[in-house]
């Protein structure tokens, strides 16, 4: 049960996976790395770091451009689309695409945001699924 709103504010849930060098990525994609380029403990005046990662590292939302050349780029999508109340549907089936029958008996009318919780969230961070859920054309 979500917490009650406090003084007109709602609780913000962090649904992201922790980014680390052991986090599994799409086969062939760039893994996360973090390195210091300067360190104060080695005499530098500041700490500086370098991050290397794919935009598909960890929890993320794919823009339409990810799957079609004429789709909208991420920068064209308003951030407001990703912030606000959301409805969560859990789909326990571990194989195949997400189909309309997965939502049978659920009232989804008027929703602005739908989050789909699947078994992939329960995998260890270093394991990439052989078969993962995806929305079908239906």
Task: Locate the predicted segments by residue.
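Active-/binding-site microenvironments in catalytic and ligand-binding cores
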Residues: 1-138
């Amino acid at each position: 049960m979500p917490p009650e709103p406090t003084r007109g504010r709602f609780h913000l849930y962090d649904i992201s996976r922790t980014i680390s060098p052991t986090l599994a990525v799409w086969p062939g994609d760039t893994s996360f790395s973090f390195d210091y380029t300067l360190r104060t403990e080695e005499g530098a005046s500041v700490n500086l770091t370098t991050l290397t990662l794919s935009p598909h590292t960890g929890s993320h939302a794919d823009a339409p451009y990810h799957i079609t050349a004429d789709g909208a780029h991420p920068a064209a999508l308003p951030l407001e689309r990703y912030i606000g109340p959301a409805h969560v549907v859990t789909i326990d089936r571990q194989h195949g695409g997400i189909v309309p029958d997965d939502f049978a008996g659920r009232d989804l009318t008027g929703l602005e945001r739908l989050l789909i919780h699947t078994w992939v969230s329960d995998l260890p961070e270093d394991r990439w699924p052989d078969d993962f859920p995806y929305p079908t054309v239906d």
